[in-house]
C-alpha cells in the first residue's frame, strides 16, 4: 500500500538503508519516510536540498520536510477531528449494542468488531502516523515501531472482513432464510478467525520492523530481506486481500440481495407484516451498502498513490507529493469516523442510542419512544409452529361455481386448495407463487429487531 514520499537510498557511513517504501503500514504505520539524498536536485517534497559533501550528509541527516506553521495547524486540526469522531463515535456504537439486549443480533456483533477495529486504528495509529509523516522523525521507540507496522494491517483486515461477514449473513438471511442463522458461539468463532488471519497477514511487518538511529534523526522502517521487489509483492498481496477481494464478494452478494429486495413485490400482497419486514430489511441492506461504498472510496486514492509511486519513483520528487500523501492518508483514516454517523442517520435504534449517550447536552431530548426503541423486543408471530406442522394442518377451502345457484345444493365442487404454509397469514392474489416469493421475507429464526 501507499507509502510516504521517499528519496533515494542513503547511508549512515556504515550500513546502507534502502527506502523500500510502499506498504499499508506506511500509511497506517508510515514505516519508511527516509531522509533524502542531498544533492543539486529538489527533494521529494519539492524543497531545495542543500548541496553537501557525502561526509557531511552522513554526519548531518536533519529533517528537510518543513512546512509552514499554518499548514501544520490545518493538518493537525483535520487529523484531530478524525481521531475524536472515530474514537468516541465507535465507542458509543459498541456501548449501544452491548448495553442493550435488543441490539445484540448477529449483524450487530459484527458491527461491534468493526467499531473496535476502527476505534483502535484511530486511537493508536492515526496521530502517531501523522506526526511521523509530518516531521519524518520517529519519537516513539522500537517496540511501538513494531506495533505501528503490525497492528494497522491487522485492524484494517478485521474491519473489511467484518463487513464481508455481514454481507454474507445478509445474503443467507434473505436468499435462504429457512436455514438456521449463526449462533452467538458461531459468530464469536468467525470473529476470532478473522483476527487470527489478520495477525498472520501482518506478522511480516512486525518481524522486519527496525529502528535506525542516525545523527539528528531516528527512523522506523521495514527492511525486507530480499529488498524492494519482495516488499512490493507483499503489499500487492495486501491490497488484494484487504481491498479487492472482499469488495468483490460484497459487490456480488449485495447485488443479488438488492435484486431480491427491490426487484418487485408479490402481486396482491396485503399483509402488513410482510411490508414491515421487507422495509426493515431494505433499510439494513441500504445502510451496509453505504458503509461499504464509503470504505471503498476512502481507501481507493491511498492504494492508487502506493501503486503509482512504486512504479513511477520520480513522483516522489514532485513538489507537492507530501501534501498528496497527507491528503490520501487523511481520507483513508477518515473511513474510521463515518460509520457511526451513517448508523445514526439511517437506523432509528442507533439514533435513539446516540440520543441517550448525549442526553447531557441541553439541545438533545430523549423521548419515551427512544427509550422503548432500545428496550422492547418485537417478534413477528410468523411460523409459530414448524413448517412441517403447518404443512399437516392444511385448511381445505371448497370453491363453488357461482352459476350453480344455491351452493348448499351444488354437487360441482372444485378441487380442494391447501393453505400455503409460507403465506404467514397474508393474502396473495397474484399469479406469482407466494411460497417462493415470500420465502425470503419471513423466517422462523429471525425477528423484526434483526433488520430494523
Curated annotation (Swiss-Prot):
Question: In the record, which residues receive a covalent lipid, type S-palmitoyl cysteine?
Answer: 361
- Give a GO molecular function annotation for the protein: tachykinin receptor activity
Q: Which residues are glycosylated?
A: 9, 23, 40, 60
- Fetch the InterPro entries from UniProt: GPCR_Rhodpsn, GPCR_Rhodpsn_7TM, Neurokn_rcpt, NK3_rcpt
Q: Membrane topology for this entry?
A: Multi-pass membrane protein
Tell me the protein family, please.
Belongs to the G-protein coupled receptor 1 family.
Q: State what protein this is by name.
A: Neuromedin-K receptor
Report the source organism: Rattus norvegicus (Rat)
Amino acid at each position: 500500500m501507499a507509502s510516504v514520499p521517499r528519496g533515494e537510498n542513503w547511508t549512515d557511513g556504515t550500513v546502507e538503508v534502502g527506502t523500500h517504501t510502499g506498504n499499508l503500514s506506511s500509511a497506517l504505520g508510515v514505516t519508511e519516510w527516509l531522509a533524502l539524498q542531498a544533492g543539486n536536485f529538489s527533494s521529494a517534497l519539492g524543497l531545495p536540498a542543500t548541496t553537501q559533501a557525502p561526509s557531511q550528509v552522513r554526519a548531518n541527516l536533519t529533517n528537510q520536510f518543513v512546512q509552514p506553521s499554518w499548514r501544520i495547524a490545518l493538518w493537525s486540526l483535520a487529523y484531530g477531528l478524525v481521531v475524536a469522531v472515530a474514537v468516541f463515535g465507535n465507542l458509543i456504537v459498541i456501548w449501544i449494542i452491548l448495553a442493550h439486549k435488543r441490539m445484540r443480533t448477529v449483524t450487530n456483533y459484527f458491527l461491534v468488531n468493526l467499531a473496535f477495529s476502527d476505534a483502535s486504528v484511530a486511537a493508536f495509529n492515526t496521530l502517531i502516523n501523522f506526526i511521523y509523516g509530518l516531521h519524518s522523525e520517529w519519537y516513539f521507540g522500537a517496540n511501538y515501531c513494531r506495533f505501528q507496522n503490525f497492528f494497522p494491517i491487522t485492524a484494517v483486515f478485521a474491519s473489511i472482513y467484518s463487513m464481508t461477514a455481514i454481507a454474507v449473513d445478509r445474503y443467507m438471511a434473505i436468499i435462504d432464510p429457512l436455514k438456521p442463522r449463526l449462533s452467538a458461539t458461531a459468530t464469536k468463532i468467525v470473529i476470532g478467525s478473522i483476527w487470527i488471519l489478520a495477525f498472520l497477514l501482518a506478522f511480516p511487518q512486525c518481524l522486519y520492523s527496525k529502528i535506525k538511529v542516525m545523527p539528528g534523526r531516528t527512523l522506523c522502517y521495514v527492511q525486507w530481506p530480499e529488498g524492494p521487489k519482495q516488499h512490493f509483492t507483499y503489499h500487492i498481496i495486501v491490497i488484494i486481500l484487504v481491498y479487492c477481494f472482499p469488495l468483490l464478494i460484497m459487490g456480488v452478494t449485495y447485488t443479488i440481495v438488492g435484486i431480491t429486495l427491490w426487484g418487485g413485490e408479490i402481486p396482491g400482497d396485503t399483509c402488513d407484516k410482510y411490508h414491515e419486514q421487507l422495509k426493515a430489511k431494505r433499510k439494513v441492506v441500504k445502510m451496509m451498502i453505504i458503509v461499504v461504498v464509503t470504505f471503498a472510496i476512502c481507501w481507493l486514492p491511498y492504494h492508487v498513490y502506493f501503486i503509482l509511486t512504486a512504479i513511477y519513483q520520480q513522483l516522489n520528487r514532485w513538489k507537492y507529493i507530501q501534501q498528496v500523501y497527507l491528503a490520501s492518508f487523511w481520507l483513508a483514516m477518515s473511513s474510521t469516523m463515518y460509520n457511526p454517523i451513517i448508523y445514526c442517520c439511517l437506523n432509528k435504534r442507533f439514533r435513539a442510542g446516540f440520543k441517550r449517550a448525549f442526553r447531557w447536552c441541553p439541545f438533545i431530548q430523549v423521548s419515551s419512544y427512544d427509550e422503548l426503541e432500545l428496550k422492547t423486543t418485537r417478534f413477528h408471530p410468523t411460523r409459530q409452529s414448524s413448517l412441517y406442522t403447518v404443512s399437516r394442518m392444511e385448511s381445505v377451502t371448497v370453491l363453488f361455481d357461482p352459476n350453480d345457484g344455491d351452493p348448499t345444493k351444488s354437487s360441482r365442487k372444485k378441487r380442494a386448495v391447501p393453505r400455503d404454509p409460507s403465506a404467514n397469514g397474508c393474502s396473495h392474489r397474484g399469479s406469482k407463487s407466494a411460497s417462493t416469493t415470500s420465502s425470503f421475507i419471513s423466517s422462523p429464526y429471525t425477528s423484526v429487531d434483526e433488520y430494523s
